[in-house]
Amino acid sequence: MRTKSPSSLNLKVIFIGSSILILIIIYLARSNISSSSSKPISKTNLSQEEEETQHKQEGCPTTQQCTKMPLSLSDALVHYVTSNVTPQQTFDEVSVSKRVLDKKSPCNFLVFGLGHDSLMWASLNHGGRTLFIEEDQAWIAIVTKKFPNLESYHVVYDTKVKDSDKLMELGRSEECRSVSDPRNSKCDLALKDFPADFYETKWDLIMVDAPTGYHEEAPGRMSAIYTAGLLARNREDGETDVFVHDVNRPVEDEFSATFLCKGYMREQNGRLRHFTIPSHRARAGRPFCPVEVDRRR
């Protein structure tokens, strides 16, 4: 999920910086409120020694320590203010995911791809868990050396963009319409050899912005998109918000519409699509895709 264009996008820098500053202000405000509410209503009759003892017992030695900025937010603020490299999604595209994160964070956020925007996603999900799945081990080393707090897994894909038509045909088979743990799926599109944590976590948001998919020999996002839908359907209850980037390309366009379903699509903004997929385990007999209603009537 590295930068796809060298062009400078100042609006994105402003947006990211503003978002992080808002998070910082909210965090500090909550910390101050919490600190104030934990103090006695009146200290008129307490001696200075008693006040110091009580303050120590409250576990918050000084106001400065209580309101210290989280490392993830300070790292993000410094990085995006000083960096000329901006995330590859536009202001409007990032806004789609941010609105959902504003409602759901802190949450479990799975991101296919590790890149220049990863620190932003982790910061917008402050207090939650953000896991990045990346195919390039050398790239993981570069990014995590700079930001060691980012959590990432190295994975290997066995597909190629040039085989996408065959994989689409395969995906229409009955085996690929069955909902199960991807590790037990009989569909060859399912990703089955990833770390156990990938399958066993209940993901609230999934972003598909990798693996590489801009040339015929690249792995492509066919399996990533299919598996994202399978993880969402196979969760015990609730729903999962799934985002797919680069839907201007044939693979991302066709595979997201087919396996995440047009009926589950909530929004498309630029090259980003947002789907909300409910648990299929919570209601038996739910079709793989919802029945689409002709809105022209």
From Swiss-Prot:
The keyword Methyltransferase applies. It is an enzyme of class 2 (transferase). The chain crosses the membrane at residues 9-29. Disruption phenotype: No visible phenotype; due to the redundancy with GXM1 and GXM2. Reduced levels of methylated glucuronic acids. Gxm2 and gxm3 double mutants show reduced stem mechanical strength. GO terms for biological process: lignin metabolic process; methylation; polysaccharide metabolic process; xylan biosynthetic process; xylan metabolic process. The keyword Transmembrane applies. One of its GO terms (molecular function) is glucuronoxylan 4-O-methyltransferase activity. GO terms for cellular component: Golgi apparatus; Golgi membrane. Residues 35-47 have a biased composition (Low complexity). It is a single-pass membrane protein. Its EC number is 2.1.1.112. Expressed in hypocotyls, roots, rosette leaves, stems and siliques. It is found in: Golgi apparatus membrane. It holds the Pfam family IRX15_IRX15L_GXM. Residues 35-63 are annotated as: Disordered. It comes from the Eukaryota. Keywords: Golgi apparatus, Membrane, Methyltransferase, S-adenosyl-L-methionine, Transferase, Transmembrane, Transmembrane helix. It catalyses: glucuronoxylan D-glucuronate + n S-adenosyl-L-methionine = glucuronoxylan 4-O-methyl-D-glucuronate + n S-adenosyl-L-homocysteine + n H(+). Methyltransferase catalyzing 4-O-methylation of glucuronic acid side chains on xylan. Belongs to the methyltransferase superfamily. This is Glucuronoxylan 4-O-methyltransferase 3. The gene is GXM3.
